[in-house]
Regions:
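Hydrophobic/aromatic-lined pockets within catalytic cores
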Residues: 13-14, 61, 185
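Mg2+-dependent endonuclease catalytic cores in nucleic-acid-processing enzymes, primarily RNase H-like
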Residues: 40, 55, 62-172
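Single, functionally critical "micro-switch" positions that shape active/binding sites
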Residues: 45, 97, 174, 178
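Anionic group-transfer/hydrolysis microenvironments
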Residues: 46-48, 100, 181
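ATPase catalytic-site recognition across NTP-hydrolyzing enzymes
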Residues: 1-45, 50
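Non-transmembrane alpha-helical segments in soluble domains
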Residues: 6, 113-117, 181, 185
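Short beta-strand scaffold segments in enzyme catalytic cores
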Residues: 52-57, 182
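Acidic, Mg2+-coordinating catalytic module of metal-dependent nucleases/exonucleases
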Residues: 168-186
Length: 186
């Protein structure tokens, strides 16, 4: 397969047999371009102490294509730091957040979801169904309706590792931007 050849010849990480979305990066990544102002924007947020990840998307209604154009990928920072990074990319952009944030705390008894709302973010709970999200992303990838700017290095690194284990279970490791991708597509 072409992606295996690239891995062996050029040392480029490849999508393996257990890849969640076995679509070569070359078919997904695009050179950055200026996004038209009229394209709707949204971001998706996956929160955590070790890693908080955010991905931003712009939607071209004319061709039903979603472009992921920037990312925030940082660990060990307070919600106020992440919120500032989110607002710096457009405080007017609405977002979706991992619904599990309603139950997570960084300090006694306070929900992360509420922390982000208090920081002024316009967020709603994302649909966190793995099956629904994986299928929705797969549908867009295989029809060329999900594209990712090449500048999203962390996204690319996670994409090539996102896989199912030998028993068919999703490997929940280094998948924060893949989670945000599911949230933003659904």
């Amino acid at each position: 397969l072409p992606y295996m050849r690239d891995a062996r010849i050029r040392g480029i990480p490849a999508l393996g047999a257990g890849a969640v979305w076995p679509v070569p990066l070359a078919d997904v990544m695009v050179d950055p371009f200026e996004l038209p102002d009229h394209w709707p924007r949204v971001y998706a947020l996956d929160v955590g102490w070790n890693r908080t990840a955010v991905v931003w998307g712009a939607y071209d209604k004319g061709i039903d294509a979603l472009y992921l154009y920037t990312e925030h990928y940082r660990g060990r920072a307070e919600p106020s730091n992440h919120a500032a990074a989110i607002k710096a990319r457009g405080s007017w952009i609405p977002g979706v957040i991992d619904p599990a944030a309603r139950g997570r705390t960084q300090d006694a008894g306070h929900q992360l979801y509420a922390d982000y709302e208090e920081q002024g973010l316009n967020i709603i709970a994302a649909n966190n169904s793995h099956d629904v999200g994986i299928y929705a992303v797969w549908e867009r990838l295989t029809t060329g309706r999900l594209k990712v700017f090449r500048t999203m290095v962390n996204w690319r690194n996670e994409y090539v590792k996102y896989r199912f284990d030998e028993k068919g279970h999703l490997v929940k490791k280094d998948d924060h931007l893949m989670d945000t991708t599911r949230y933003i597509v659904v």
